[in-house]
Amino acid sequence: MRRRDFGKLSFATLASTLLTEEARAGSGAGSVPDGKTCPPPFPKVEGVTAHVAEFVVNTRYEAIPQNVIELGKKSILDGFGLALAGQRAESGPIMLRYLDSLESVGKSTVMGTRRSASPEFAALVNSVAIHAEDFDDTQLSAEKSKTYGLLMHPTAPVLPPAFVLAEKLGASGKELMLAYHLGVEVECKIAESMAPRAYEEGFHTSAICGPFGAAAACARLRKLDVGKTRIAFGLAASASGGLREEFGTMTKPFQVGHGAEDGYAAVELARLGWTAADNIIEAERGFMRAVAGTYEPKWLLEKLGAPWTFEWPGVSIKPYPSGSLTHPAMTEMADLIKEHDVRADQVASVDVGASQNNYQTLLSHDPHTGLEAKFSMEFCMAILLLERKAGLPQFQDAVVNRADVQAMIRKVHFHVDPQAQAAGNDKMMSIIRITLKSGQVISGHSSFGKGSPANPMSYDDVADKFRGSAEFARWPTAKAERIIELVRTLETQSDMRKMTALLRG
């Protein structure tokens, strides 16, 4: 089989073709003892890591479509706001105490504080802050076969290391945006290429793919050649890790932050002459084989920047600080409440149906902390009915444990619905049925939440979200407004160090 043919194969076709060819060769592939299922074959394709590195090294800013640049600005602005707000999260003070214990000395900005640190530790703390509230952007999946319809959080692993290195080097806004887009594109296409097994078996995609994105962004800012960029990917892959069991705990954002730190360190070590496997993506004992079992090389050989992930299938910006799988239901619930003027004291019960994948991920059915509430469909429905809003102030322990909130949570029945299941993982359908005490039933359904490519937020919408994040962080209004305007015209900024004073207390 020729290398170029692999890029055109689906998982099913790839499995069938490889098993047939190996059987013809007398390898005995597909003959598994004791009735066990034969694992999917692993593509024998060389040069994948090299191709990704070439994309990072050779892509010019002018190659990025203008609409992709503008979409990226929204995610960058959102990321800055969440970095500020994340220092007020429960994990924020702990991370700062941890930073103190490291005795880190450096000039890199720890956003939302008066502190500075060495670049790699600033990247760690800033990344944890962005992901702390689970309020950051998400990558949609391009294929129905991919589990859960979304793949990873693209900005949290990439923006912090890219920003601290741009700050260190005095890079321009254009240079930062190019590095950011390359990092996001690499991590998202790696996530897209992996077999669903990686996520299904418990790997946290943002944590295992994020180091590649961080390394890609920093490699471009450091102007590494192809060889050293390949080495950086080898280091990043070997340092990657993260598990879904940590969802709903502080360790979920720590996994993402650790990946940002590791991606930065990988580039610095590669620059200094460190060695690593230079074919880590496709190697027999490499990244894809270890975490996913198999993958589709076409996403990395043919589809980097063709189209850009921001262009298709798109990146969603969250209007609510909860798991993305809650957002279609939250968007529909908010619309139903407004349309029918539903009051909490009128509600007898709420029924929410979703797919098996959604139900298994939103596993906090009896939440008692703000973190648990982020992965609780029951809480998300309850708080909208009680307060008609669900922002950062609502996802706090004290709010979750209020008697009226707990009582409303018990009225919400969340379950697997056959119609939602049949819609497919790419739709994330939620079906809502509100029964009032009068007997009236109000119902609706939605497959896409506000902020998704199907229902996008404008730059001004994201600016309003940023203002809310800044207010939650008690950030000076004048600084917040200046950040909004600087990001709006980021490509005209000659030196990213102009942002330092605005993001540091």
Model-derived regions: residue spans:
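N-terminal secretory signal peptides and thylakoid transit peptides that target proteins
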Residues: 1-14
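N-terminal core-entry segment
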Residues: 9, 26-313, 496, 502-505
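Conserved acidic/glycine
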Residues: 9-10, 432, 462-463, 469, ...
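Short, well-ordered loop/turn and helix-capping segments at boundaries between secondary-structure elements
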Residues: 12, 256, 265-276, 293, ...
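C-terminal segment of classical bacterial N-terminal signal peptides
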Residues: 19-22
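Flexible, glycine/charged-enriched surface loops at secondary-structure junctions
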Residues: 66-67, 90-92, 274-282, 339-350, ...
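Glycine-rich phosphate/diphosphate-binding loops and the adjacent beta-loop-alpha structural elements
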Residues: 312-321, 325
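Intrinsically disordered, low-complexity Ser/Thr/Pro/Gly-rich interaction regions
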Residues: 323-474
